[in-house]
């Protein structure tokens, strides 16, 4: 199984597809003036969910994530870029590696801020686990 290590090569290139890109706003700050870690986690969960829906061809739910280490703060004005890649697919669940990178305000400097592996389960209309279909021939992206 492929696992994301937030501390490994923090300034290498992102792995996976750019799935979510958003700007960090003043309303998202913690008491120290940095962006609240829960906001970053939420963006990562959304990105993982998008990748999961694409792969499962239907609804998915987050059931777990491995340990996360925030290695750098995100600041107001930074563009948070979240990259995803499916690393394992089981019968009803999948693991998706998710990396969050900050493009620093008004610069082209890009730094990894955290990473984790999320586990998603494909569900049917009743919310029960369902089999994940074979991988489609070509991903559908807008």
Model feature map: region roles:
Residues 38-58:
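Active-site helix/loop of acyl-thioester processing domains in fatty-acid/polyketide metabolism
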Residues 57-73:
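Small beta-barrel nucleic-acid-binding modules, principally OB-folds
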Residues 2-37, 54:
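Catalytic strand-loop segment that frames the active site of acyl-thioester-processing enzymes
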Residues 3-10, 14-20, 75-76, 87-142:
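HotDog/MaoC-like acyl-thioester-processing domains
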């Amino acid at each position: 199984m492929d696992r994301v290590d937030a501390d490994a090569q923090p300034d290498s290139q992102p792995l996976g597809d750019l799935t979510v890109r958003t700007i960090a706003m003043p309303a998202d700050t913690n008491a120290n003036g940095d962006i609240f870690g829960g906001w970053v986690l939420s963006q990562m969960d959304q990105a993982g969910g998008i990748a999961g829906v694409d792969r499962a061809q239907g609804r998915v739910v987050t059931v777990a994530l491995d340990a996360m280490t925030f290695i750098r703060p995100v600041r107001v004005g930074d563009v948070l870029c979240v990259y995803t890649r499916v690393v394992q697919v089981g019968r009803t669940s999948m693991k998706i590696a998710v990396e969050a990178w900050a493009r620093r305000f008004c610069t082209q400097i890009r730094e990894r801020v955290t990473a984790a592996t999320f586990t998603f389960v494909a569900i049917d209309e009743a919310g029960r686990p369902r089999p994940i279909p074979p991988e489609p021939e070509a991903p559908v992206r807008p």
